[in-house]
Amino acid sequence: MYRVIFNGMNILAKSNNISWSSDTDTLGMQVTFDSLVNLTEGSIISFLINNKEYFRGIIIKKSESKFSYNYTAMDYSFYFKNEVIKQFNGIKASSAITSLLKEYGISSEIVNIPTTINKIYKQSINDIIEDILKQAEEDQGIKYFKEMNINTLVVKRLQDMRIKPKVIIGSDITIESSIEEMKNKILIVSSEESNKSIYATIQDKNNINKFGLLQKIESVEEKNRAQAKNIARNLLKQYNKAIKSTSINLLGIKNAETIRANRLIELNVANKLKGWDKIKSANHTLSNNKHNVTIELEW
């Protein structure tokens, strides 16, 4: 059912305490495990579930004890930390990401993203892609995300990522609600220091009366001025609410490996959870033939 492959050999029998995690706020997926096998940093390992390759990555950290080794492996997004120079002139976002990755020999599967990108970048590959997706989300009002699928970067729409694993839900849950990130007024201004123009303003008067003024200022370039009102509307929709979250322990029965960050899952728990909620983070542990998952939901 599970295999850990190094140089064509299954080393699972000599390995234990396998865990893996993904989070919307981190660069990629990481796998940690203990093993009697001595691997070197930079070695490539694969993790297979039901004969399907689920993870491929590089050993980036190693610690040695008296009788065994502990390893941390990261998927190929490890290389997205490379800093580059790239200019885009009126190219749609999906084509911009494809062009960037192709230049550095990285294969990709990118959903169509029509937002136009006009910008010069001097930063990491990851930061460039994050900025492009941020522009697209503000322009389209659609949540996009990226992740590595073996050796291919995939960019998809969150709304398309519904999963239905079979799990046993743990004990009662606690739901937290926060207005720390709430914004009920949005100003779109010029990114040029000499230009003090306000391109668009949108606010929720009812929420301002209830919570007080919580304002966000977003800067855009002059050439994107026509999108200002649309960006303001989408930002208000994104920020003008209390954020709810909860952490849940699950025992995986079937297809638990599909549980990862940037998925929508439906867990009906009494009157506390109904409908499809976003997985912000997922932490898996595989020990003694039990697959346990702790997830953080956010909505």
Predicted regions and their residues:
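Sec/Tat-exported extracytoplasmic proteins
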Residues: 104, 133-136, 140, 190, ...
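Short, acidic/charged, Gly/Pro-enriched secondary-structure junctions
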Residues: 1-5, 34-64, 92-103, 256-282
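Short beta-strand-centered interaction patches in the first periplasmic/extracellular domains
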Residues: 68-69, 110-181
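Short acidic/polar beta-strand-loop edge motifs in secreted extracellular
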Residues: 77-99, 108-131
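Oligomerization/assembly interface segments of phage tail-like spikes and tubes
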Residues: 22-35, 67-78, 188, 241-252, ...
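Acidic, small/polar-enriched beta strand-loop surface segments
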Residues: 37-38, 148-288
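Assembly/oligomerization scaffold segments
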Residues: 1-80, 167-175
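Well-ordered beta-strand positions in beta-sheet-rich domains
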Residues: 53-58, 70, 85, 199, ...
